[in-house]
Every structure is written in structure tokens, then in C-alpha cells.
């Protein structure tokens, strides 16, 4: 697509990079877990990952070349192998299935997703009916709903609130998916509170710090540029939210790589914004910059709204090995 009829080799553009962008702590941890497992169990056990470890095509394809096998069901894993749960988390029934098998299980669920799982379990234990604000069919939502045997009500939008059937308005609680739009979720929470004044919930605290930071930065970035490219896969929830936010202000495109950029879009553009979803590696951003430099004069600048320093440790079973080995 990018090698069309574009002729602007001498064109000058400013490319503004959003900071923070790309990997969050949960994604970094999940990828590190898989890479440590590859080294630790090298030549002794097959490594299976249940679902995509993170929703990014480049990462999944890279790990496949390192020998990782991605599966959709526990029974696809061979006995005596290693099974890693993705960063999005899994239901209790999946964990129970895995326990019945001869598998070495490693849980790469993001700690912030685990926090939501615990909230659901506590509310359920205390007799509350649970509402989950999130996207039906997303892996994280499936895992969260599957933490309890009682049905969880999924609210995707304002209209869903009108259809809610509840048992007791005084025993109602909500949690949220961690990768939602902060602005959209606030509107949904406000309507829930108006309809059910005694509802309990974490406000916006379930939406992870990295999601919030990337959304804040992307909104500001979109105000400064003529077009925004968001590096991320189409099935990445947080990347889609960044595209939606940027599109309120300017042209916005969610791309897996520089190969999806149509240079003809840039004919009248002087400022380009680039950011990346929480599961997109920075090499993809660098490739976009290199690609643009081949076709125009690029002046690079940074837009840094907030600094991030959050890190999460790997599971205990890999921690000792990590001290002896630094993953690729």
C-alpha cells in the first residue's frame, strides 16, 4: 500500500512520539515469563500458551519462531508439558481442567487483572450481584466472568443498563475491564450510580494505570498533529480505545506495522503523531520512523505527559532462574 504514487521525498514533517507508549508492566511480565520458560525448560518440555499471550501479532509470531505453541483449549496441551495462561487471565473452570492434567502450569495473568478477579470473588462471597463493565467476548472479560459460578451481568454501553434485571438494589456491585476508555466508563458508572444509588464499586480504579496514561497522552497528541498512527493489533482492546480517542480530534489509524501506511494520506500533512498500545513492542514504532525517513525529512520530538516506573515480578517458580538468566 505504501509504495503507491507518492512523490514527496523532500517533504518536511514533524513526528511527535507519545510517551508513555507501548509495553505496560503486565505485558512486559507476561512476555518475560514465556521467554524465561523457553530457556528454563529448553529441550525438556514443550511450552504451550493458552490463547495469545498478549494481543499483538508481532509478539505472537516472534514467540512461535522460538518454539512456543499457542492453543485455544487446555486439552490441546500434551501431558508432561508446560502450560502458560495469557496476560488476560482465565476462568476458574479452565484452572480446574488444567489441575486434572499432568501439566506444569505458569500463570502470566496481569496482577491488575487478578485484582479485579479478587474483587468479583469478594463481592460474590458477600452476597452481591456483580456487574462487569466490559466487552463481551474479550479474553479478559471471559476470565473475569468465570471467577464465580453466579451469573455476572455484562454492561457494554449505556443502553445495557436499562435492561439490567437485579435481585436487590442494596446488594449490587460493579467492576470493570482493565483496558476500557476512561471517559466512556465514567459515563457508564455515573448512570449505574444514578439508577442504583447504593451500588458498590471501584469507580475508575480497575482501569489500569497504563491504559489511563496512554489515553491521556494520546488525547493530547491528537490535538497537536494532523494524523495519528497507533501501533497495535486489531484485537487489542486498549489499542482500539487509543484509536477511538485520537479519532475525536484528527485522522487516526490502528496499524500492525509500517507496511499498512499509505503515504498518499500524508500529502498535506506536516505533523504526524505516533503512539503504541500496551502490547505493542517499540521496535514497531522504530520501523515506522525508519520508513517515514526513507520518504521525507523527519524532525523527531517527544510528548511526555507522565513517567512510568511500575514493574511486576515473575511467578516464584521462575524467579530464581531469572537471577541467573536475562531474557532476550
Curated annotation (Swiss-Prot):
Binding site for [4Fe-4S] cluster: 24, 110, 208
Organism of this sequence: Ehrlichia ruminantium (strain Gardel)
Keyword rRNA-binding: no
Tagged with keyword Iron: yes
Family label: Belongs to the IspH family.
Positions contributing to dimethylallyl diphosphate binding: 55, 88, 138, 236-238, 279
Function noted in UniProt: Catalyzes the conversion of 1-hydroxy-2-methyl-2-(E)-butenyl 4-diphosphate (HMBPP) into a mixture of isopentenyl diphosphate (IPP) and dimethylallyl diphosphate (DMAPP). Acts in the terminal step of the DOXP/MEP pathway for isoprenoid precursor biosynthesis.
Catalytic activity as recorded in UniProt: isopentenyl diphosphate + 2 oxidized [2Fe-2S]-[ferredoxin] + H2O = (2E)-4-hydroxy-3-methylbut-2-enyl diphosphate + 2 reduced [2Fe-2S]-[ferredoxin] + 2 H(+); dimethylallyl diphosphate + 2 oxidized [2Fe-2S]-[ferredoxin] + H2O = (2E)-4-hydroxy-3-methylbut-2-enyl diphosphate + 2 reduced [2Fe-2S]-[ferredoxin] + 2 H(+)
NCBIfam families according to UniProt: ispH_lytB, PRK01045.1-2, PRK01045.1-4
Swiss-Prot/TrEMBL cofactor(s): [4Fe-4S] cluster
HAMAP family the record matches: IspH
Record's keyword terms, sorted: 4Fe-4S, Iron, Iron-sulfur, Isoprene biosynthesis, Metal-binding, Oxidoreductase
The protein's annotated pathway: Isoprenoid biosynthesis; dimethylallyl diphosphate biosynthesis; dimethylallyl diphosphate from (2E)-4-hydroxy-3-methylbutenyl diphosphate: step 1/1; Isoprenoid biosynthesis; isopentenyl diphosphate biosynthesis via DXP pathway; isopentenyl diphosphate from 1-deoxy-D-xylulose 5-phosphate: step 6/6
Top enzyme category: oxidoreductase
Name the record gives this protein: 4-hydroxy-3-methylbut-2-enyl diphosphate reductase
Residues annotated as catalytic: 140 (proton donor)
One MF annotation (Gene Ontology) recorded for this entry: metal ion binding
Binding site for isopentenyl diphosphate: 55, 88, 138, 236-238, 279
Biological processes, Gene Ontology terms: dimethylallyl diphosphate biosynthetic process; isopentenyl diphosphate biosynthetic process, methylerythritol 4-phosphate pathway; terpenoid biosynthetic process
InterPro entries: LytB/IspH
Cofactor note: Binds 1 [4Fe-4S] cluster per subunit.
Binding sites annotated in the UniProt record for (2E)-4-hydroxy-3-methylbut-2-enyl diphosphate: 55, 88, 138, 178, 236-238, 279
Enzyme Commission code: 1.17.7.4
Amino acid at each position: 500500500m505504501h509504495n503507491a504514487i507518492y512523490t514527496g521525498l523532500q517533504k518536511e514533517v514533524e513526528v511527535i512520539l507519545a510517551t508513555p507508549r507501548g509495553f505496560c508492566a503486565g505485558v512486559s511480565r507476561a512476555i518475560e515469563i514465556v521467554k524465561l520458560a523457553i530457556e528454563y525448560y529448553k529441550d525438556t518440555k514443550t511450552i504451550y500458551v493458552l490463547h495469545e499471550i498478549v494481543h499483538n501479532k508481532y509478539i505472537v509470531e516472534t514467540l512461535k519462531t522460538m518454539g512456543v505453541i499457542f492453543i485455544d483449549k487446555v486439552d490441546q496441551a500434551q501431558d508432561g508439558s508446560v502450560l502458560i495462561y495469557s496476560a488476560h487471565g482465565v476462568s476458574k473452570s479452565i484452572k480446574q481442567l488444567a489441575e486434572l492434567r499432568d501439566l506444569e502450569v505458569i500463570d502470566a495473568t496481569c496482577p491488575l487483572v487478578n485484582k479485579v478477579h479478587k474483587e468479583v470473588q469478594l463481592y460474590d462471597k458477600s452476597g452481591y450481584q456483580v456487574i462487569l463493565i466490559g466487552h463481551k467476548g474479550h479474553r479478559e472479560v471471559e476470565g473475569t466472568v468465570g471467577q464465580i459460578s453466579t451469573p455476572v451481568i455484562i454492561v457494554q454501553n449505556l443502553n445495557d443498563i436499562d435492561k439490567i434485571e437485579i435481585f436487590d438494589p442494596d446488594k449490587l456491585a460493579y467492576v470493570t475491564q482493565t483496558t476500557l476508555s476512561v471517559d466512556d466508563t465514567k459515563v457508564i458508572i455515573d448512570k449505574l450510580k444514578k439508577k442504583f444509588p447504593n451500588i458498590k464499586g471501584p469507580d475508575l480504579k480497575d482501569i489500569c494505570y497504563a491504559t489511563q496514561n496512554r489515553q491521556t497522552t494520546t488525547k493530547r497528541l491528537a490535538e497537536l498533529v494532523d494524523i495519528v498512527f497507533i501501533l497495535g493489533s486489531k484485537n487489542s482492546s486498549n489499542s482500539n480505545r487509543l484509536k477511538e480517542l485520537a479519532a475525536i480530534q484528527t485522522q487516526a489509524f490502528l496499524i500492525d506495522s509500517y507496511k499498512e501506511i499509505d503515504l498518499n494520506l500524508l500529502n498535506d500533512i506536516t505533523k504526524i503523531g505516533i503512539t503504541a498500545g500496551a502490547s505493542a513492542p517499540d521496535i514497531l514504532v522504530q520501523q515506522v520512523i525508519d520508513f517515514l525517513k526513507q520518504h521525507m525529512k523527519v524532525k523527531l520530538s517527544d510528548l511526555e505527559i507522565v513517567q512510568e516506573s511500575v514493574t511486576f515480578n515473575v511467578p516464584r517458580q521462575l524467579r530464581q532462574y531469572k537471577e541467573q538468566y536475562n531474557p532476550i
